[in-house]
């Protein structure tokens, strides 16, 4: 069964719904990063959340980045998502391994993430400055933290579910999530009804494991609430790294650091955080970048001198 994301509304548009199955996507990411079950659950939940938040974007030029770091052994998770439902991400420590949560017997994502930190959402909407929203970590379980973010930072009452079920061979058995939001003007009793229904249903991964599709899960939750599915898309894990981007990153470091790399004379290998692809740079490659950096610095100095001369002429003319 392939992954799917759906957008829907209910109760005459008073409820907005994003729901997705991300089993294949999370399995691919877990294999790329060689994740333990705990790391796979943490990264998978963030990727699933990112997929749905990417679907909320209105333009293909917009990008949303989610970061969570609570000082735990996972060392933070970062996810970047796009409007076409593509997503990429990485976890600081993919080999974090903790005992199961003693309260519910599930993978202990909350302890792996930690509570001493925050959840940050960065939206690049193509404007001069990105929108940055940040809230303290509520539980570290990610779904609760994201629900708190929507309510506190965006003032949208939201219910969020994120689940990753890891099989015995460390493959991903099921993964998915939903974000349900009450829009302005919705009756408060509607929120109470939703809370009651969500408290009574099995977990999302349980329903998916029983063979329900993501559509059937949402139809089950919103039975009798005038559910309308508006759109379906296929979420995917996609990294857009390239050698050119890595070269730009090298050029962005200071001249002194780049010169040191060149003087060391060793072949440098840089890995993409998101897909682990390695890019190798010989001394000759770094030398070419160094020349480009030197030219850039010379051009900047020349431009500054030109501006200074023009300013000096203007001041003389005033006299």
From Swiss-Prot:
The record's annotation in InterPro entries points to:
Heat_shock_Hsp33, Heat_shock_Hsp33_C, Heat_shock_Hsp33_N
Q: Where is this region: Disordered?
A: 300-319
Kindly list the places in or outside the cell where this protein is found, as annotated in its UniProt entry: Cytoplasm
Modifications made to the protein after synthesis: Under oxidizing conditions two disulfide bonds are formed involving the reactive cysteines. Under reducing conditions zinc is bound to the reactive cysteines and the protein is inactive.
Q: SUPFAM superfamilies of this UniProt entry?
A: Hsp33 domain, HSP33 redox switch-like
Cytoplasm found in the keyword field: yes
This molecule's function is given as: Redox regulated molecular chaperone. Protects both thermally unfolding and oxidatively damaged proteins from irreversible aggregation. Plays an important role in the bacterial defense system toward oxidative stress.
List the protein's name: 33 kDa chaperonin
What organism does this protein naturally occur in?
Clostridium perfringens (strain 13 / Type A)
Recall the taxonomic lineage recorded for the source organism.
Bacteria, Bacillati, Bacillota, Clostridia, Eubacteriales
């Amino acid at each position: 069964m392939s992954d799917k994301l759906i957008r829907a509304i209910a109760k005459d548009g008073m409820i907005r719904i994003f729901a997705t199955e991300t089993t294949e996507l999370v399995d691919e990411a877990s294999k790329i990063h060689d994740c333990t079950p705990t790391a796979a659950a943490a990264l998978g939940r963030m990727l699933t959340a990112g997929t749905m938040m990417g679907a909320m974007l209105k333009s293909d030029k917009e990008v949303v980045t989610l970061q969570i770091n609570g000082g735990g052994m996972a060392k933070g998770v970062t996810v970047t998502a796009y409007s076409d439902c593509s997503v990429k991400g990485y976890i600081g420590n993919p080999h974090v391994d903790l005992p199961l949560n003693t309260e519910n017997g599930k993978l202990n994502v909350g302890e792996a993430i930690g509570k001493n930190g925050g959840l940050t959402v960065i939206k690049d909407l193509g404007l001069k400055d990105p929108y940055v929203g940040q809230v303290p970590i509520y539980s570290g379980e990610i779904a609760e933290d994201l629900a708190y973010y929507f309510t506190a930072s965006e003032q949208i009452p939201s219910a969020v579910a994120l689940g990753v079920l890891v099989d015995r061979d460390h493959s991903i058995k099921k993964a998915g999530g939903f974000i349900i939001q009450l829009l302005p003007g919705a009756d408060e009793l509607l929120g109470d009804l939703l809370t009651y229904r969500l408290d009574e249903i099995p977990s999302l991964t349980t329903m998916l494991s029983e063979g329900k599709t993501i559509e059937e899960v949402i139809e089950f939750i919103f039975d009798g609430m005038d559910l309308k599915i508006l759109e379906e898309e296929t979420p995917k894990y996609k990294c857009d790294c390239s050698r050119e981007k890595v070269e730009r990153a090298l050029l962005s470091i200071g001249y002194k650091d780049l010169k040191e790399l060149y003087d060391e004379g060793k072949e440098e290998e840089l890995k993409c955080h998101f897909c682990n692809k390695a890019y190798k740079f010989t001394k000759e490659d770094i030398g070419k970048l160094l020349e480009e950096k030197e030219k850039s610095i010379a051009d900047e100095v020349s431009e500054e001198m030109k501006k200074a001369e023009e300013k000096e002429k203007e001041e003389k003319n005033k006299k």
